[in-house]
Amino acid sequence: LNSNENHLDLSDNKPGAATRLVNYEPSLFGGYRRIEGYSKYDATYGEVTEAGSTTGAGPVLGVAIFKNDVTGSETIIAIRKNADDTNYSFYYYTAGIGWRKYTLTHSVTRPMTLNSLTVTKIRHAQFNFGSGNHICFVDGVNPAIVFNGTDWKEIKSSHSGGYHADNNTAGGANALDAPAVVDVFENHLFLSGHEATRAAIAHSAPKDAYTWTAAAGAGQIPAGFDVVQIKPFRDNLFVFGTKSIKKITVSADEFILEDVTSNVGCIARDSVQEIAGDLLFLSPSGFLPIAATDRIGDFNIASVSRPIQSTLLDIIENEDLDSLDGVVVRSKSQVRYFITPTDDNGILAAAECTGIIGGLTNSGGGVSWEFGELFGIRTSCTTSDYIGTDEVVLFGDHDGLVYQQESGNSFNGADITSVYATPFLDFGETEQRKIMRKV
């Protein structure tokens, strides 16, 4: 897709360019093809609610594919508000049975609203520090909560720290009580995005997600700006603000905060995605990758989305970027961004939802980015991971269902609207009339 240049220039100088490219994906080997469809993850038990009841209400707040050491297989976890109270619950999926609620350890509850803040999306990070796979969930309202396949432990600053099966002591003075973002770096769990302390980045003790005391090696790092997102890339943990980017490195067993740039930042928290050995994010000037050069510690930031700049500017100016969901399709070297617009009546139907699809493709002997538009996919959260050797791309919707992308040739039974429009073809002469014939 190239929405930034005029038709005559595209016709003469960029054969194969499209002026409209809706629901087409660029191929790694060149050219375009219509995207595949999506369907309910389970045709019978698609809605995240206990089978035969209405325990769930509202949108799916989060979805994850967890490598569960206890069951010995991957577990799909979805999160949704309770229908009968103001809390939300975690559900796990079982084939042929549907969704079942987890019972949280120590009678923990997860309020939807607390301290004038409301849960809108739940993010997660998985890790294994040597004692099995764990997954940590954050929502920006409640304490982070860690699941090890057996029990759930909330990480609170008022706790003494450490893991105990019978008591919830996880946490310590350096923990953040309402983080919105989470990731893992150098065998530490990192939390940030706490509304009350927006510049704070907290990390656990080494190889211990349950201990957040200074004596054990936990700590906090002030970013110097409101943190939008944190994301590890190679030997650095990048810290994104709206106007600046910094990185955390390790020196002499200490975390060091260094400047990357003070001229650009990230304007959509969930746009930060790692794909094909790079880190991509949405800035006011478009999609930017952080690409490491041959010199250690030297990073180059350059826009890869100039051909669709006008399309992106329209999205940035007119859409709520907090609704943006991003997901990577690794097998296709693709990243997909979904935007769910609203009006005075609330969330719009799927047919009104837009997005951007980007992929790497062979071009001119090298690999470059190509982009297109998405239309007709409404998301409230997204994730992708492997179940066995198969990549599974999931998204939750505002209707409370979990869907699987790359499934079928329709949008859950509806036709896929697709458009591929070329520039006007003048065959090298704009003023000469032509006669077109076909065989």
Residue ranges, per PLM feature:
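Surface-exposed extracellular loop regions of Gram-negative outer-membrane beta-barrel proteins
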Residues: 88-90, 237-261
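Hydrophobic or amphipathic alpha-helical targeting/insertion segments
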Residues: 121-161
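Short loop/turn positions that demarcate and connect the beta-strands within blades
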Residues: 57, 176, 222-225, 266-267
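Asp-box/WD-like beta-propeller blade repeats and closely related beta-sheet repeat scaffolds
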Residues: 149-181
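Short loop/turn segments that connect beta-strands within beta-propeller blades
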Residues: 94-97, 148-150, 250-253, 293-294
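Carboxylate/His-rich catalytic cores and anion/metal-binding grooves
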Residues: 177-209
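Beta-sheet repeat architectures centered on beta-propellers
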Residues: 1-135, 264-278, 285-439
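Structural signature of WD-repeat beta-propellers
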Residues: 80, 139-140, 193, 240-242, ...
